[in-house]
């Protein structure tokens, strides 16, 4: 049987909020079976809980933001990507502000935190969402699609007219039965253009953004002295984002996702469209010892 997973211990970290530029504390706590991923705003009295789910997604302009009434937690996608990549089902995420700290702009620090806390299996079968037929959403020339696949596969294409992209388009496809999320995806950082960052700062946004937590480009080159962590780091970060956005479904996917110039808004529209079409998916478990589960989920990933 493939079992649900949570953390072995509670662990805490400190970082900077991408948009406020202020110090943010985050604490990851184990949670009981069937809890899912629940964010808690501990700076409020009483603390307010927001479950990671498609219906609780509010603003998707610059990051994925979860809302409960007037209360919000933004920039959740990198942490959710790490949680998904390590197969964690149940977790409390306590934060001291309205955003998750940006850390180094990737999911790597969150992977390290989760692995440091330890991962334990729980006495309940892990639930999966299996894609039964293709579902697609489009907006202008952008699109995102789910298709049936025996495992978990993510493909993505980005298109930027910039000198560092030889033909504008960068594409990657990763089958997680043969690819390690931790090694190949988790360290890919968010990226932005200097001109956009300056415009955001005028609107009191991206105040915590720096070369320490993003790849920054001017009109000609990458400004980070250390260069890239992966040759295709830009598109791999979009895959990282997508994995986090898709985990708002609440369960790991058995299926394939493909995105072309998709972002948080379109990713969220796709998962809402999927949920609404009940013949397009099913919730499954792998409880029979003789049943062959998709190889991507056979063992927890516990090391870099």
From Swiss-Prot:
Its EC number is 3.5.1.108. One of its GO terms (molecular function) is metal ion binding. It catalyses: a UDP-3-O-[(3R)-3-hydroxyacyl]-N-acetyl-alpha-D-glucosamine + H2O = a UDP-3-O-[(3R)-3-hydroxyacyl]-alpha-D-glucosamine + acetate. Zn(2+) binds at residues 78, 237, 241. Its cofactor is Zn(2+). GO terms for biological process: lipid A biosynthetic process. Keywords: Hydrolase, Lipid A biosynthesis, Lipid biosynthesis, Lipid metabolism, Metal-binding, Zinc. It is an enzyme of class 3 (hydrolase). The active site is at residue 264. Pathway: Glycolipid biosynthesis; lipid IV(A) biosynthesis; lipid IV(A) from (3R)-3-hydroxytetradecanoyl-[acyl-carrier-protein] and UDP-N-acetyl-alpha-D-glucosamine: step 2/6. GO terms for cellular component: membrane. Catalyzes the hydrolysis of UDP-3-O-myristoyl-N-acetylglucosamine to form UDP-3-O-myristoylglucosamine and acetate, the committed step in lipid A biosynthesis. Belongs to the LpxC family. This is UDP-3-O-acyl-N-acetylglucosamine deacetylase.
